[in-house]
Amino acid sequence: DIVVLEDNPYRELRFSGTATDSFGKELGEQCCMLGTFSKIVAPGMRIGWVCVRNKALREKLLSYKATADLHTNIFSQLVLAQYLADNDIDAHIEKTKVLYKHKAELMMDCMRKYLPEGVEFTPTEGGMFLWAKLPNGMSAVDLYRVALTKGVAICPGDPFYEKARNVSTFRINYSNSSDEVIEKGIRLLGEACEELLAK
């Protein structure tokens, strides 16, 4: 028996394109679905959820969870429960998707405008990040260092690969920045890319 672990923390934040079905619909007891409130309610609210139909698997997960950290922060759970009782979470998610779509489109427009030729990015249909790629042979860790001197933070792709180091991919977040900060940040990131390309 194989259990499929479906980890889709950005599922609710898809703002364009075609929504994807959960594996859980097809796989039933063979699927374990994970989700989080940190992406849809508040980043500091490090509370997630697990949906498992298989009773034996659920019992094992509960046992592992209990030994991993004894228990999840009770106060945070109570605050979240009260928030969910007092607010329409679906309306909140819809509002967030509209905001994130605007920010993502602005960031992509700025990337087209300010990033030098050879730097590519993957258009997004949801979530809170954009992925970009430097020309082959260039390290996103090097870009991170140059960009940081300009006050711009990116996340090099290295932690997202099992063994690769000094990869050319990097991730940038648009969820918590104003329009002005997004434009200024991407302009400065473009300058950092130019400096790196000139070396």
Language-model-derived ranges and their functions:
Residues 1-199:
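PLP-dependent class I/II
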